[in-house]
Amino acid sequence: SVAYKGFDATADSLLSRTRKHRLLRSGEAFSTSALVAEQTRIEALMRNNGYYYFSPTYTTFFADTVAHPGYVQLQVRPAAQRPAVAQRPWYIGHVYVTIRDENESNITGRLDRPGYTYFFPGTQIPLQPGVWRRSIQHMEGERFAAWAQKATVEHLYGLGIFSAMDVNYAPRDSSFNCDTLDVHVSATLAKPYDASLEMSGTYKSNEQIGPGLSYELSKHNAFRGAETVAWKLFGSYEWQLGASSSALNSYELGSQLSFKFPRLIMPWFNPTAMGRRYRRRIAIALTRAKLLGQPLPLQLYDYTPVNGTTTLALSGNWRNRSGFFTFVTVGGNLNYKWYTNPRKRHELNLFNLEYNSVIRTTAAFDSITRANPALYISMRDQLVPSISYIFTSTSPATDRHPYWVQFLLKEAGNVTSGLYAMTGRSFSETGKHLLRSPFSQFVKATAEGHYTRVFSPRLSLAMRAFAGVVYAYGNSTQAPYGEQFFVGGANSVRGFAVRTIGPGGYHTQRTKYSYIDQTGDVKLEANAELRTCLFGQLNGALFLDAGNVWLIRPDANRPESGLTLRNLKRIAVGTGVGLRYDLSLLVIRVDLGVGLHAPYDTGRQGFYNINRFKESLVLHFAIGYPF
C-alpha cells in the first residue's frame, strides 16, 4: 500500500487532486528509481503552487517490509527537518529590471511603473516596458510558479537581443513571517548589428558546377521593441564543364528585406488581453485562497503563455538559365509563428503574394513549351496569392527514440476568386486576372514524419515518410512550377539525379544541357538509413530510398504519367552508402547512390532494370543530414 501522510492542508489537497499522476501505486514493483521520480514530481507540483524553496529531498519515505512478507507498506511524508521557508507558499512582489548596454555604461536612468522598476544607462530605456511585461510571466501578488520562472527565461532569451541575462528571486525582508519574493532581472544587451557571410559550392548531375555567396546584415532591437530588421543578398553562378560557350553559363541573384516582431500582431487576437483575463482568474483565486485557506485551482497552473513572432518580408529573385529562359519572382509575405507548448509549433502565412514572370526565352525553350503545354502553363506570367498553415510536432528532448511530424495546408487564389464570384463571375471560371495578370488557384497538402530508432550510442536506424498532393482548379489547370513535387537528388531517392524521375512511368532522354525537370502533382516517398559511428567524428550510413511523382490530370505529351492504380506500382528504388563528417555545427555529407529499379521502361526485365551498372551510380555532396 502507499499512503501520503503528514503534509499540511494545502499540500495534502494538492497531492489528493493529483492522485492520478502519482508514480507510486499499489501492486507495482518496489524500486528506488520510482521513489526518486515521485520526489521530483512532488517538487514540481509544490514549486508550481508557491513553494519556491521546496526541493526533492524534502519528501521522505518510510517502508515497512515486516507486516506483510513480500510486500512493502510505504508512507510518503514531508521531511521533518525541512526549513521553515520551504513550509509555506511564497507570493510575487515587485519586479526590478536592470538593463546594461554592450559597453557596460553606468546606470543613470530609472523608470517606475506599477509592479515594475527599470534601471538603465542614459535617459531613455533601451527596451520598452511593454516587452518586459509580455516576457516576464509573473504578476505582483500571485503565487510563485516554476512554470512562470521557466517561461520568463525562455521568453527573454527568445528575444535574441541579450548577450547575458539572469533572473533571481529574493525575500522582500528578513522577517520570520515574510512570504513575498521580489524578482530581480539583470540583462545585458548584445551588439545591435550582426553580419554573416556564407559561401557554398555546387556540382550537379548535369555537370553544372559553380560557387554561391550569401550576405546578411541584421539590426536587433531596431525600434526599442526587440524587433529585428534583416537584409539578405545572395547569388550563384554555374557553368558547364567542358563547354567553351558563355551561353552555357547560368546565374541567380536575389534579395530579401524582413521585419521581425517578437509578438503576434493580429487584429482578431490579443495575447495581452488573454493574459489579463488569465490574471483576473488568478487574482480571484488568490483572494479566496488567502481568505478561506484554499489552494489555487490546478488548471490555472496549466496555462501556457503564447510565445510568437510576426514577420513581414519582401523579396525578389532573378534566375537566368543558359540557353533557355530568364525567370523573375517578386513577392511579399506576412508570417506568424507561435508555440502552444515547447514541442508544438504553428506557422501561418496569412498573406503571401508572388508574381512570376518569364521575361526572356530562347527558340529552344519555346519549342519545348509548345510540345509540353503543361510546362508552359506552370511557368507563364502569373500572380500567386496564397495562404498556408504548417503544424510541427517533435518528441521530448529526453526521448530515446525521437520523432518529428509536420503537416502543411496551402491554398491559392480562392479568396480572389471568391471576390470575383460576388460580382457574378463563376468561381470555377478561367481567364480571371488580378493586377492585369492571371492568378493561380490551387490547394496543396503535405504530411511528413521522421523517426529514429536508437539501438546504441553508435548505431541507429533513421526513417522518413512523405506524402503530398497539389491540385489546380478554377482559374488554373496547372499548379505553379515551384509548388509541384519532384523526386531524386541528395535529399530524396539518392540512386537517381535530382528531378529526373517520373511522373509515373514517363521518361525523357534529356541532355546534360537541359533544364526541363520532371515534376508531378502527387508525391509518395520513403527513406531508411542505418547510421553508425566509424571512428572519431566520422560516421557511416547504409540507405534505402523509394518514391515517385504522378500527375492528377492525364498529359498526352507524357504517357504513363497519370495517377492510376497501375502507375502507383511504378516506384523508383535506390540504395547506397555514405560518409558524414560531424563538426557539431556542420555536417559534411557524401553519398554514393545506386539505382536499383527505375519506374520507366528501360528495356530490361526484372526488379533490377538498370541497363549498365555505371548508369546507376550517382554521387551526392551535401551539407547536413538528408532527414
Range-by-range predicted roles:
Residues 51, 192, 224-226, 309, ...:
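Strand-connecting loop/turn motifs
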Residues 197-199, 229-233, 312-314, 405-409, ...:
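Membrane-embedded beta-strand positions of outer-membrane beta-barrel proteins
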Residues 11-14, 25-28, 125-126, 145-404, ...:
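Gram-negative/organellar outer-membrane beta-barrel architecture
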Residues 114, 118, 202-206, 347-533, ...:
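C-terminal outer-membrane beta-barrel translocator/porin domains of Gram-negative envelope proteins
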Residues 3-9, 59, 77-83, 95, ...:
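Solvent-exposed coil/turn segments that connect beta secondary-structure elements
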Residues 1-158, 167, 180:
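Interaction-mediating elements
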Residues 487-495, 556-627:
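C-terminal beta-signal and terminal closure region of outer-membrane beta-barrel proteins
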